[in-house]
Amino acid sequence: MAFRTNTSKAQEGGNSLKPEGDYEVIIDTAEVTRTQSGKDKINIVYVIRNDVQQAYQNGLIFDSIWKKKEPNEDDQSIGGYNFGQLMAIANAAKLPDGKEYAGLDDFLAELKGKPLRVHLYHDDYNDKWYEKIDRHEPTTLTAVKHKAKGKSAPAQTAAPATAPAQNAAPVSDPYPF
């Protein structure tokens, strides 16, 4: 099939840093995971909304919330994670103030699918640049018309396991590089 070049649509590889700034996003996943080195963290994946005129629509932004070295009482109520950071996300996602959750997993499940606005900046760590989020705000838009990017299920090549693995490998760092 023939095609023409169109350099106005040129873009760098998928692992390049997104520009610093504000992005309207939807929380795709929010879950407790473990790094390869055995540290627990809350991993939050944001999808850049495709119903808003902005660059990198359907792109992903990764955020991690780590356990505090010296957790206070509020932090301890959620397993030692930074309570203030999670409440900033809850406030931006417009979760009801004062609602009681049975546990951290229930709270994280309620975040899924919520729209908000994040501010992304670049952080230098060990001579590599990473995308980080330093601010969460409520979305500035009233209606959400984001369409999730279709995911095709992978073809099953083997019979499903009959029992869960006892020594499953921990989830690796969410950074794609």
What are these regions (language model features)?
Residues 1-177:
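Short beta-rich binding modules
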